[in-house]
Amino acid sequence: MARRTKIYEGKAKILYEGPEPGTIVQYFKDDATAFNAQKKDVIEGKGVLNNRLSEYFMTGLAQIGVPTHFIRRLNMREQLVRACEIVPLEVIVRNFAAGTMSKRLGIEEGTQLPRPIVEYCLKNDELGDPLVTEEHIAAFGWASQQDMDDILSLALRVNDYLSGLMYGVGIKLVDFKIEIGRVYENDYPRLIIADEISPDSCRLWDIATGQKLDKDVFRRDLGSLTDAYSEVARRLGVIPKTQIAKPTLIN
């Protein structure tokens, strides 16, 4: 097999040059990190589950007219995505107080917010992805005002879709993080959902019990991460309900 050209390796994924112009192969690793990679481990099967779940969410978004970079899943660990220019922001949508918001504002975890709150962080691991305002974004030219209007609209549409989907299977969407890519169609820029949507990037709590079904299981040593992610996948029908917790590792 021809050796592929690695473009970038992050904490949870590796990007390779795609087989067709304008495409990238996104490989999901089993590495788990927390607290800006201060805590690390390898969790067998995590990459397989995140690949399948991200495919499921991205496909669902495309079906309701939300543009994404996803093209198709290639195998158990890889998907083909559209190459795009990443906007240097993490976009966070919060429905309930948790994590850094609870610490920052002194709001008890689990408190429902008056409305979905959208926050922005600068993508910079060395600085710990600091929270920034729209004033910072405009002043430093990280995104235009039109971009910000489009990003807000995309983020809230993703929230509507994911919230309803999760509620239907007994899961509360506490918050989530997305990344935005810029593509050019006939020289006209367009913003799309990029990166991934998975339990790595969402806070998901069981509505009935409050059990955490996301990366907080790893952050806070609450049990098996693959068990939690598999439970989400089973409820959504992404893997069979009778399947054992660890997926068979193929490819």
From Swiss-Prot:
Transmembrane segments: none annotated. Pathway: Purine metabolism; IMP biosynthesis via de novo pathway; 5-amino-1-(5-phospho-D-ribosyl)imidazole-4-carboxamide from 5-amino-1-(5-phospho-D-ribosyl)imidazole-4-carboxylate: step 1/2. GO terms for cellular component: cytosol. Its EC number is 6.3.2.6. Keywords: ATP-binding, Ligase, Nucleotide-binding, Purine biosynthesis. GO terms for biological process: 'de novo' IMP biosynthetic process; cobalamin biosynthetic process. The keyword ATP-binding applies. It catalyses: 5-amino-1-(5-phospho-D-ribosyl)imidazole-4-carboxylate + L-aspartate + ATP = (2S)-2-[5-amino-1-(5-phospho-beta-D-ribosyl)imidazole-4-carboxamido]succinate + ADP + phosphate + 2 H(+). One of its GO terms (molecular function) is phosphoribosylaminoimidazolesuccinocarboxamide synthase activity. Pfam families: SAICAR_synt. The keyword Nucleotide-binding applies. NCBIfam families: purC (TIGR00081). Belongs to the SAICAR synthetase family. This is Phosphoribosylaminoimidazole-succinocarboxamide synthase. The gene is purC.
